[in-house]
Amino acid sequence: MKKKIQIVQTLLDALPFIKKFRDEIFVIKYGGSAQTDQKLKEKFAQDILLLYTVGIKPVIVHGGGKRITEILNRLKIDTTFIDGQRVTTADVMEIVEMVLSGDINKEIVSLLNNHGAKAIGVSGKDAHFITARPKDFEKFGYTGVIDHIDPSVIHNLLQEQFVPVIAPIAASNQLGHPGYNINADLCASKVAGALKAKKIIFLTDTPGVLDKEGKLISTLTEEKIELLKKDGTISGGMIPKVDACLEAIDEGVEKAHIIDGRVEHSLLLEIFTSEGIGTQVLGG
């Protein structure tokens, strides 16, 4: 009986958040262990189904860098990185699109549909809803920077109660162009801004932003982030994550979250509890 009462209490505790977030758009950047570990995949799908069922509108943007590198190595195609960004040659671009749009995207869509969601996979090339330009063609090849997002494509899918799953491939306005490989974090932040999402949530392999003692920092502002960058507290791979958060905030997203995707049901714990489990980034 005690366990049953606890279940009821958990539902009651979540109710204010369910009411608050009903009909709101949440953009979720899906990556890291949550995307590769089978048990975590199942928990992620359950979380998305629950969000979907209670009236929240999840939009998923996924990465796939590890699998891209794995396939490139298998095919003996050289791949290099500059400042953490992949150099995308024409040969690499072909594999990037194959893996992101043709492999990982469909795997996620199938996973969600098998759990009862109504998911549909798209890339920025579909209806040219994401267009881009070269970041620096001489240096990065077909690695791109987003120029424009047409939010109506995703809004139409949401209106029809689909869960959009977006592969970070952008179109070019040039006929016959292979398109652009887009950093998934930055793609997610741009999509969130274009959709005027309530939240953007990044699933990572870290608890969030940590201080110099390794303790979780639960709340950050742009001013605090700049200070922590200067003193080296925020460094390495966390820099592009917080930059993506700030870009989303600047585009009008209310809150950005960096959470540990290795924790089962991390999305629900962050969204439906007062304390959350990760770092939230606020405007101002």
From Swiss-Prot:
It comes from the Bacteria. Substrate binds at G64, G65, R86, N181. GO terms for biological process: arginine biosynthetic process via ornithine; L-arginine biosynthetic process. It holds the Pfam family AA_kinase. NCBIfam families: argB (TIGR00761). Catalyzes the ATP-dependent phosphorylation of N-acetyl-L-glutamate. Belongs to the acetylglutamate kinase family. ArgB subfamily. This is Acetylglutamate kinase. It comes from Nitratiruptor sp. (strain SB155-2).
